[in-house]
Amino acid sequence: MLQRLSQWDYAISATCLGHRFNVQVARLARVISHSGDGYYYALFGGIIAFTPFAGAFWSLALPAFVIELMCYLLLKQIFRRDRPQALPVFIRPSDRFSFPSGHSAGAFVMAGSVAQIFPSWAGVAFTWASLVACSRVLLGVHFVSDIIAGASLGLLIVYGIN
């Protein structure tokens, strides 16, 4: 059964990759992926600091990000799943292993935190997080199961804290 899931995962990931050979799609996927880099969270946090909800947001988001980072690093070392090497890569990954997706986990921690504190922005936040996750597959650095695991990890942490 595990082998069948792995085959399904690879087939879906390869199909996704087949749709991003357009230069504009690859470029857009890179921009979306980079929007999930950690330093943008600090920038967003600086913006939130000027709202009356800054304390509530950071009391949820900061511990969630710390827990997410620790879990993400631990899981990468436990599973040590290589990135999809047979598939062309369109971005330089930050490390060798793919499971779980740290970008997906972080994006969903941010989206879940935004949704809890600013409910009217939940749709935008989760759409952005989903795009970050999908961009990682389109860029060839993750399998579909990596982003599902990362998104699940991020959400479990945020909603577990709250």
Pin down the residues of each PLM region:
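N-terminal transmembrane-helix/juxtamembrane module of multi-pass inner/ER membrane proteins
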Residues: 1-41, 72-94
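Transmembrane helix-loop junctions in multipass membrane proteins, especially transporters and channels
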Residues: 53, 80-85, 140-145
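Membrane-embedded catalytic cores of phosphoryl/pyrophosphoryl-handling enzymes
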Residues: 88-162
